[in-house]
């Protein structure tokens, strides 16, 4: 289990400008929906964006604190369209 604040900090260490929204999908705090808005995604395809998020969350994924992720990764420009 991981807290929402801790998960957000992992992401912001890799992407300091990130706006992060996390929601618990099951009530167990290990199945999470994560929305990340960051300029770091500019010019990257979906797979590369997800890789960046997985790199940031490597530790809690490997130690089992996160079991499943539903990801949305956008730039702020993409939100405005």
Role assignments for model-derived ranges:
Residues 1-19:
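N-proximal, solvent-exposed amphipathic alpha-helical segments enriched in charged/polar residues
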Residues 17-33:
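Short edge beta-strands and adjacent turn/loop segments
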Residues 27-29, 41, 78:
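Short Gly/Pro-enriched loop/turn and capping motifs at secondary-structure junctions
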Residues 33-50:
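A short interface-forming secondary-structure element
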Residues 54-81:
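C-terminal structural segments of small proteins and small subunits
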């Amino acid at each position: 289990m991981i807290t929402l604040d801790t998960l957000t900090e992992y992401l912001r260490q890799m992407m300091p400008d990130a706006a992060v929204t996390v929601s618990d999908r099951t009530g167990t705090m290990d199945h999470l929906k994560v929305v990340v808005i960051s300029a770091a995604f500019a010019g990257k395809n979906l797979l590369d964006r997800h890789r960046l998020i997985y790199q940031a969350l490597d530790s809690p994924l490997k130690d089992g604190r996160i079991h499943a992720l539903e990801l949305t990764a956008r730039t702020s420009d993409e939100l405005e369209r």
